[in-house]
Curated annotation (Swiss-Prot):
RNA-binding is among the record's keywords: yes
GO cellular component: large ribosomal subunit
Source domain of life: Bacteria
Subunit structure: Part of the 50S ribosomal subunit.
Protein's recorded name: Large ribosomal subunit protein uL1
SUPFAM superfamilies documented for this protein: Ribosomal protein L1 (SSF56808)
One term of GO molecular function: rRNA binding
GO terms under biological process: regulation of translation; translation
Cited function: Binds directly to 23S rRNA. The L1 stalk is quite mobile in the ribosome, and is involved in E site tRNA release. Protein L1 is also a translational repressor protein, it controls the translation of the L11 operon by binding to its mRNA.
Source organism (scientific name): Bacillus cereus (strain B4264)
Length: 230
């Protein structure tokens, strides 16, 4: 661990903590300061001027990144009849109804995203205590409770990411891997920033995007000039 710590310290020296870099410069620095030996995830963090305790300042949704995240998402769809067939045809990894509910209750979690048709939510709701804390519960706001299972599965497989403000007003979103071309990471970064601007709550006062940073899984954070994300 000491060796990794030393690498991180050396990498951090390349970042001027007082500076706010352009999106392009920040992405270049993130790659330069990546200390992981694997293809690390690049994550953007937004500190927003909202009060998540207030219902009218909750921010939650999903967006399809133009270049995906570099991660293959395993999709579980709760559906029956024709909708189950549609989900299978769209490329869902697992499709079923009540059979998977029992499996999950017994500790099975070999999936990354859960989609459910509205008529299945009465049953899927039983998994609230299990899926909720893991952020896996289907939700209409993120497009994962829908009869259009084909669209839902296609978007997830194409690189759809969910975002949700935490109690401190922060949102963390993966924007790709360090192996991505700089331009693709920047475009993904700008896509999520633009989306968050569009969903700004009317009740939010003062500066909305207070601070934005980007970092690789094991690298230091790089502060970004918000104006360069427009």
């Amino acid at each position: 661990m000491a060796k990794r710590g030393k690498k991180y310290v050396e990498a951090a020296k390349l970042v001027d903590r007082a500076a706010a870099y352009s999106a392009t410069e920040a992405v270049e620095l993130v790659k330069k300061t990546n200390t992981a030996k694997f293809d690390a995830t690049v994550e953007a963090a937004f500190r927003l001027g909202v009060d998540p305790k207030k219902a009218d300042q909750q921010i939650r949704g999903a967006v399809v990144l133009p270049h995906g995240t570099g991660k293959v998402q395993r999709v579980l769809v709760f559906a029956k009849g024709e909708k189950a067939k549609e989900a299978e045809a769209a490329g869902a990894d697992f499709v079923g109804d009540t059979d998977y509910i029992g499996k999950i209750q017994q500790g099975w979690f070999d999936f990354d995203v859960v989609v459910a048709t509205p008529d299945m939510m009465g049953e899927v709701g039983k998994l609230g205590r299990v899926l909720g804390p893991k952020g896996l519960m289907p939700n209409p706001k993120t497009g994962t409770v829908t009869f259009d299972v084909t669209k839902a599965v296609n978007e997830i497989k194409a690189g759809k990411v969910e975002y949700r403000v935490d109690k401190a007003g922060n949102i963390h979103v993966p924007i790709g891997k360090v192996s991505f071309e700089d331009a693709k990471l920047v475009e993904n970064f700008k896509t999520i920033a633009d989306t968050l601007q569009k969903v700004k709550p009317a009740a939010a006062k003062g500066t909305y995007m207070k601070n934005v940073t980007v970092a690789s899984t094991m690298g230091p954070g790089v502060r970004v000039d918000v104006s360069t994300l427009a």
